Amino acid sequence: MMFATELLVGGLLAASTVLGAALTRVEYPNNATSKAQMWVYVPDKAVANPPIIVVIHSCQSSAESYSRNSKIPWKQGSDKKGYITVWPSAPNSCWDVSSPRSLKNGGGGDSQAISNMIVHALDKYKGDPARVFVTGGSSGGMMSNVLAATYPYLISAVSLYSGVPAGCFVSSSGGVAQWNNSCSGGSSRATPEAWGNVVRAMYPGYAGARPRMQVWHGSADGTLAPQNYQETIKQWTNVFGYPQTAVSSVKNFPERNYQTDNYGDHLQGIYATGVGHSVPSNLTASEQWFGL
Ligand SMILES: *[C@@H]1O[C@H](CO)[C@@H](O)[C@H](O)[C@H]1NC(C)=O
Ligand SMILES: *[C@@H]1O[C@H](CO)[C@@H](O)[C@H](O)[C@H]1NC(C)=O
Ligand SMILES: *[C@@H]1O[C@H](CO)[C@@H](O)[C@H](O)[C@H]1NC(C)=O
């Protein structure tokens, strides 16, 4: 008998060690038309009033597969620092960054679904509303820009990798989750003011705080032309009223052949010479940008 009990206890302990924290699908109050799924990773040692980090996947991916990608180290960061990561999963193969639903505050698209996930995460995990952060690569980088434009009041800072300006993938026919060759190829160019107007039009009349933006791009990006880096910088410099030239630059930082350009406390660009699509996430540098 005793032997059997010991075996049972030992088995339970082993099972709980093996199970531990895991990416889990969570239902959330969602008033958007988009039925994007919400997945969450709560580390075993979550801190009180945890920061919430939204990690947005690329095309032909999902919350589950992105969270297993070795170049996307946010689960490990969560284990180490105790913040919670929210992993939205797109209803289409890419995020909808082309239709009016998604390109507008309250439009009902994927961006609104993700905003609902942020609200729910803050409520369910008693998250810190002053420490909500967004990151993503490629299509997730595009969505990061769109979220910053459509739901600025929910987000403190963004660190986005290899995306395009907010609104650059707009579909002339209003299509959902459409690819846009003009933008991806780097031919969608506009003045800083025109790009800034695109952001302002996504939430007309908004005059509150906006997230601090960190923009990464590789010079050898063959999927989303490097010109999209310059266009994104033009966009946010205009929104923040910064000059077009960086106020300070650091060569070979945070890595060799990367250059960091600071435009003001709300905008930093990091251009990776020789790096293709998509620039791997640098957990340390993104966490630093988030103040974690
Ligand atoms: C959707 O829900 C959010 C809160 O999660 C709320 O702020 C917003 O007003 C709602 N929108 C509509 C159209 O009901
Ligand atoms: C692609 O996006 C640009 C803006 O970046 C827009 O002017 C153009 O109409 C879009 N193309 C299509 C086919 O929707
Ligand atoms: C990431 O950035 C930090 C500085 O924030 C730097 O020290 C580190 O070398 C970078 N990581 C990699 C893998 O290059």
Per-region residue spans from a language model:
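A domain-start/cap signature at the N-terminus of enzymes
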Residues: 2-52, 83-84, 130, 135-139, ...
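Gly/Ser-rich "nucleophile elbow"/oxyanion-hole loop immediately N-terminal to the catalytic nucleophile
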Residues: 44-49, 97-139, 149-155
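Short substrate-entry loop that stabilizes the transition state in hydrolases
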Residues: 46-95, 168, 225, 279
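The conserved beta1-alpha1 loop
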Residues: 51-58, 162, 217, 273
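Cap/lid segment of the alpha/beta-hydrolase catalytic domain
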Residues: 87-109, 171-172, 176-179
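Short beta-strand immediately N-terminal to the catalytic nucleophile in serine-hydrolase-like folds
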Residues: 134-136, 161, 216
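Active-site nucleophile loop of the alpha/beta-hydrolase fold
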Residues: 159-168
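Short beta-strand/loop motif that positions the catalytic acidic residue
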Residues: 215-217, 221
